[in-house]
């Protein structure tokens, strides 16, 4: 909106502009203005010319090696380089030198605590992936050991998680409907192998920035939708409905239809009583832990207590004889090798790769988000690329030892943090406890009711529905809220993979929208200063008579150059019409503030050439203010500076206004 000011106010603005311009003159004025009274103005600097090799090297290093990982190898002996290399691959060799009994005490307690949480969760999560319960325990034995040696997070707890288990189970069952077949198990190992390969390649190739394309808003919606889907899937276990009679679909309509269809002939009242009783118990313990952080352990051990008590109850009452579904047999012993089970050829190889890539990316996104959260809380650095290599290695090794896709668990990591863990040794302690469970305790889980495992899963995923985050998204960014809701409804009304696809699509759509439709703003001068700001943000900022100042707030590339040119011309037409209506001087100079423009390509240069020619026809002079080093170098290389005129490129907007603005005497 044009600033309507009286002649006296305009004179004051112009006088302030000239008195406050602290820069120095760099060339003659334009339009016949007398600029001999102006002081010298600094020219816009041009960076030293770089060779093509130097430009490529700089761009490559900034993209893939911004943290300069090889800097510490410089000027070191061969043995020292080997030592540093091993420490880089296995961080435990670096921080392990300073490990002491005090740290071990904290890690030992934390490891025991998360083990009590992970064992019942592992049994339950394996069922989400349509696998036998012992594969969950296998996965919590091998993967944490590998991560402890290669990971950089001190707090993350590794193992199967609900969302990835559900995603894996859904995608695998789309390929092989008979989840009890041996090929289904082999495909699970194959997907795990390629999930690990995907994660490792991202880390080795330094492509970790790719996972940032999935926005936080989309993740919030996807996780919430997945949590509800997981909860709905547990109704069959909670109500005692047979797997053979329950729908294989995951959308809310199909699940609820299946639930109500079996209300008279499928529900088992004893199962419902057991399931609801322990679900209420688990939710109460979570509430207690949330209200009093010192009692976090109450929530951590409640799943194990639920398993022990319910197993004993079913055993002494023989409730399994009256329709209460139980776990039955669980294999004991250490993980058997599965290297010869992976599909490296054949008709299921392509399916294994597809499922593995998707599951690997989702698992990696969740792990990195968790790792960054706790790293920020404890103020230490998390190396994203090392994390990817560690995650990839543990899933590759896991696929060869009867494990399915594992990642960082938020609930277990939170307990690990609250229990006082100091290093990744807590994962080793947890792994040893799981090993002892596999060797000694697994036969005792025979009478564990499936309803309790369903209750454990429901209680675990409740926190994934983050209402507060959704409300905050609505308040801050409506587009982010749409992305969140799109992913959420895609999961609960269609399927997990459709919800994930919607989340990715909306995230990319937002990026494309921001790139192709960047923000521009009309600037005005703040009273009493030489500062120019957005007139919508600062209504008192006064526009300069006869001048239009526009700021472009993004890089100018082929994807947005035409839009920026047309938007600037629309600003010119709209502002010109308003000023004519207000009987203000016509616009004679268009100043483009380019401070926020980090780069420009050939399409952007061409757009400015067209803009210049259009403005010439309208008898409006184009002026550029403060182009950055990359931009000014390209302007010189394209000879656009010669077309516009060296005297029309300024260090600041204030310099441009002081040189080409109307004289106070004219008013």
Swiss-Prot record:
Q: Which residues form the signal peptide?
A: none
Supply the alphabetized keyword list: Membrane, Transmembrane, Transmembrane helix, Transport
Q: Where is the STAS domain positioned along the sequence?
A: 537-660
Q: Which organism is it from?
A: Stylosanthes hamata
> Function, please?
High-affinity H(+)/sulfate cotransporter that mediates the uptake of sulfate by plant roots from low concentrations of sulfate in the soil solution.
The taxonomy runs: Eukaryota, Viridiplantae, Streptophyta, Embryophyta, Tracheophyta
Q: Which InterPro entries match?
A: S04_transporter_CS, SLC26A/SulP_dom, SLC26A/SulP_fam, STAS_dom, STAS_dom_sf
Q: Which Pfam families match?
A: STAS, Sulfate_transp
As for subcellular location, the record says: Membrane
Any one GO MF term held by the record is: secondary active sulfate transmembrane transporter activity
- The protein's name is High affinity sulfate transporter 1
